[in-house]
């Protein structure tokens, strides 16, 4: 079992004692929400780790207790450039504020040594598990497997961070990383073994000579460069208290920009060697001693990482990267041993063996270099966790094969649709065409409760956004009176965009289905905006009721007087007036605003008409009941008004909204829009795949049951040919959409924008072609309301305009293609 993060503390070592009163005064002044008059203030030291001393701060009154983590430079004379806590703070803040990489939230940095003796920073305490022993003793085999897969995915997530976009472009030099690292760590080694310090090992010089002669060519080109953690091991990960997923990557002291394959190799050290501070010697790793049951082999771990990160198989240069990692570890352990001799090693007496271990690591590196084969030339063929029921989804095998969890959810979803949704479609349509169209069918609310019980609720919620919302809400009062199970249910099943794609497609087979599972537009996009960009108060006031399905929402962006496909044209004004904003303007095609349950709009307008054109727009949460909001009329789409949620034209006349409702801050609207539209567009594409499948199914059934000119439609050669071509186009589009989802998971909105644009162009055009042919096969019945085809077609046609018209997306695709060509 893993060790609880709170159980890894011990008494403060004498060499690391400092003024607790000074720390308290600093924290009270600089940490938001830090108790100022506590009855308890306790500082303990974490015993795990050999580098920057790390401490647990516990502060509170009565039964209320808050915990924080302090990380500081060690005292005494230090090696140049080592123990840079300011760099740790910088990278943690950038990742925490701008990415979904799981890291603890940082609160403040102090560089004044007068406070507690050395520089330090304070961050959140993450309640979870740390696995100190890579063998994962007392862990079930299937959980060992899941933990190592989660480790590989966490590393891939870290490596996907766009350093240029998050302000880390100058965090280090990217090219010639290994060359510089060899020089740096060799200098550190020499400094740690100078006169009066541990004796130098001649074999270290032999190892350095080999490394310098075998640096991969990719290192100088920067082809493998990006953010590097520098000490990525399983014991530097915090796992969820009960789930096998990473919630925090810690110990960033060695982070920089450079060759990311060095991180990958270092994370595999336990396969090569077994190094433990409480052991006198380095022993052999899992490759020699054998894998614990359920453990991934090194090739399987690498395959998991390469699949998640999109990196090529590293066989060609693997020997170098492992030898380099062993060399660096030897240099680090030599430095630890030198500090132990001086009496200021963070690990205390546990560091007494590091001198011997450093020399044994050098021997291990030279032994690894002498091996003929270290990694298979090609990645292993891993038997995926796939159910035989997948055969009904697609024949053969390929890259995008859903795992067992997704397949089980998919089967439940299909059964729910067949049992409850399809039989109710006519009833829902009748109400939507009656005088009571702007009311909600009572059966819909019953179906929602059933969907919750079945675990089919809020499946769209991305695992990273859910983690952020949980963190934000953890420190607030539970004013919604949610039990643990009810609270967890709000955040779905922890799916990636790729995994959700298989389920969203099923919902897309009916225009009525998405809202039953609380996965309908515009609510999903609005909820994701608040999940990603909302503060604690906004999450509590608006997101929780939306996630519960108690209210619905609208999105107000498009305006009748301007071409709104260019968001810089938006004219609606949002003027600051004291503690409020005053909104004036007209919006139309405000989806969801006609719904009687609609309580909040996300409105896009301009807060500064004189700012740079992409900094003029802001987004703000607007309560629908605010005076000055007037719904002028419902709008129709080819005659469909999409009751009961509808699309409204709305005027805003001096609508006063609290300033606290602004999302992310003034001038961030364009940024939010891009973040919202990426997943939102993809959800539309996924649903369109389902709509096309429904069209194919109805078309084939009709062709097999209706005769023209003496034979069934299915017997006409032209129909068979058309049907085959449509199937080819549908499958190609499905793969494109899944590829876009995969890119969105791995690389984020910005890097995936090209393939997202391709999917957004391809999906509606393909669906229209399929549905148009299905309508044609049905004849007059196809354009009537007796089938779902006309409504599905109208929705698909709208999506060639909504969330960006085809022309805008084609422009994006073309520009990226030209940029690619210009770099050749």
From Swiss-Prot:
CDD domains named in the record: ACAD10_11_N-like, ACAD_FadE2
One of the GO biological process terms: root hair elongation
Reaction catalysis annotation: a 2,3-saturated acyl-CoA + A = a 2,3-dehydroacyl-CoA + AH2
Motif (Microbody targeting signal): 822-824
Protein name per the record: Probable acyl-CoA dehydrogenase IBR3
Description of the deletion phenotype: Defective in root hair expansion. Mutant plants are resistant to the inhibitory effect of intermediate levels of indole-3-butyric acid (IBA) and 2,4-DB on root elongation.
Function of the molecule: Involved with IBR1 and IBR10 in the peroxisomal beta-oxidation of indole-3-butyric acid (IBA) to form indole-3-acetic acid (IAA), a biologically active auxin. May be responsible for catalyzing the first step in IBA-CoA beta-oxidation. May play a role in defense response to pathogenic bacteria.
Organism of derivation: Arabidopsis thaliana (Mouse-ear cress)
Induction: By infection with the bacterial pathogen P.syringae pv. tomato strain DC3000.
Misc. remarks from the entry: Plants over-expressing IBR3 exhibit enhanced susceptibility to the bacterial pathogen P.syringae pv. tomato strain DC3000.
């Amino acid at each position: 079992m893993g060790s609880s993060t709170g159980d890894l503390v011990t008494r403060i070592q004498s060499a690391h004692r400092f003024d607790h009163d000074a720390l308290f005064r600093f924290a009270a002044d600089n940490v938001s929400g830090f108790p100022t008059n506590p009855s308890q203030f306790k500082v303990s030291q974490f015993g795990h780790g050999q580098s920057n001393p790390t401490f647990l701060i516990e502060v509170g009154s009565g039964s209320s207790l808050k915990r924080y983590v302090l990380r500081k430079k060690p005292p005494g004379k230090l090696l140049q450039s080592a123990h840079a806590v300011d760099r740790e703070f910088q990278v943690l803040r950038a990742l925490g504020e701008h990415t979904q990489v799981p890291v603890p939230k940082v609160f403040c940095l102090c560089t004044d040594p007068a406070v507690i003796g050395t520089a330090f920073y304070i961050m959140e305490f993450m309640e979870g598990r740390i696995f100190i022993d890579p063998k994962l003793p007392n862990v079930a085999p299937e959980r060992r497997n899941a933990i190592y897969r989660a480790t590989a995915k966490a590393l891939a997530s870290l490596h996907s961070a766009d350093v240029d976009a998050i302000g880390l472009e100058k965090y280090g030099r990217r090219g010639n990383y290994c060359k510089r690292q060899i020089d740096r760590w060799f200098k550190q080694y020499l400094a740690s073994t100078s006169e009066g310090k541990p004796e130098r090992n001649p074999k270290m010089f032999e190892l350095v000579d080999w490394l310098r002669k075998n640096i991969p060519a990719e290192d100088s080109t920067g082809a493998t460069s990006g953010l590097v953690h520098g000490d990525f091991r399983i014991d530097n990960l915090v796992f969820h208290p009960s789930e096998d997923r990473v919630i925090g990557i810690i110990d960033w002291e060695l982070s920089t920009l450079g060759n990311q394959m060095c991180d990958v190799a270092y994370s595999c050290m336990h396969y090569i060697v077994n190094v433990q501070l409480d052991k006198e010697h380095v022993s052999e790793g899992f490759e020699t001693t054998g894998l614990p049951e359920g453990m991934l082999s090194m090739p399987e771990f690498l395959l998991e990482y390469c699949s998640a990160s999109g990196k090529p198989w590293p066989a060609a240069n693997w020997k170098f990267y492992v030898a380099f990692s062993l060399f660096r570890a030897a240099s680090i352990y030599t430095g630890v041993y030198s500090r132990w001799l001086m009496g200021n090693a963070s690990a205390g007496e546990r560091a007494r063996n590091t001198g011997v271990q450093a020399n044994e690591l050098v021997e291990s590196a030279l032994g690894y270099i002498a091996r003929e084969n270290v990694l298979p030339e090609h990645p292993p063929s891993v038997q995926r966790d796939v159910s035989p029921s997948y055969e009904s989804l697609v024949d053969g095998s390929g890259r995008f094969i859903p795992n067992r969890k997704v397949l089980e959810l998919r089967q439940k979803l299909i059964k729910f649709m067949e049992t409850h949704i399809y039989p109710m479609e006519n009833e829902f349509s009748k109400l939507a065409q009656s005088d009571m169209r702007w009311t909600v069918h009572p059966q819909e609310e019953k179906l929602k409760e059933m969907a919750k019980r079945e675990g089919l609720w809020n499946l769209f919620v991305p695992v990273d956004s859910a983690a952020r919302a949980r963190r934000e809400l953890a420190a607030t009062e539970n004013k919604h009176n949610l039990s643990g199970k009810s609270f967890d249910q709000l955040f779905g099943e922890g799916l990636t965009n790729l995994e959700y794609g298989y389920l969203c497609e099923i919902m897309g087979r009916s225009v009525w289905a998405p809202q039953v599972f609380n996965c309908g537009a515009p609510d999903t996009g609005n909820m994701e905006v608040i999940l990603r960009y909302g503060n604690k108060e906004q999450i509590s006031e608006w997101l929780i009721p939306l996630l519960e399905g108690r209210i619905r929402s609208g999105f107000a962006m498009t305006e009748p007087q301007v071409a709104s496909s260019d968001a810089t044209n938006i004219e609606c004004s949002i003027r600051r007036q004291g503690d409020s904003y005053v909104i004036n303007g007209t919006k139309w095609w405000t989806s969801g605003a006609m719904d009687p349950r609609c309580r909040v709009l996300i409105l896009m307008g301009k807060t500064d008409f004189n700012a740079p054109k992409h900094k003029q727009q802001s987004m703000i949460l607007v309560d629908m009941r605010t005076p000055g909001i007037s719904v002028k009329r419902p709008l129709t789409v080819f005659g469909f008004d999409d009751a009961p949620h509808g699309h409204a034209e709305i005027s805003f006349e001096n609508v006063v909204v609290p300033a606290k409702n602004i999302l992310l801050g003034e001038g961030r609207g364009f940024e939010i829009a891009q973040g919202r539209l990426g997943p939102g567009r993809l959800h539309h594409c996924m649903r369109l795949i389902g709509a096309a499948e429904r069209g194919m199914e109805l078309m084939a059934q009709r062709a097999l049951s209706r005769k023209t000119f003496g034979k069934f439609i299915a017997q006409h050669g032209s129909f068979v040919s058309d049907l085959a071509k449509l199937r080819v186009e549908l499958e190609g589009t499905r793969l494109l959409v899944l590829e876009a989802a995969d890119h969105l998971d791995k690389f984020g909105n910005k890097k995936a924008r090209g393939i997202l644009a391709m999917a957004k162009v391809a999906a509606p055009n393909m669906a229209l072609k399929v549905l148009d042919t299905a309508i044609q096969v049905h004849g007059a019945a196809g354009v009537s309301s007796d089938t779902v085809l006309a409504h599905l077609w109208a929705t698909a046609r709208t999506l060639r305009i909504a969330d960006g018209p085809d022309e805008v997306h084609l422009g994006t695709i073309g520009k990226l293609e030209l940029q690619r060509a210009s770099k050749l």
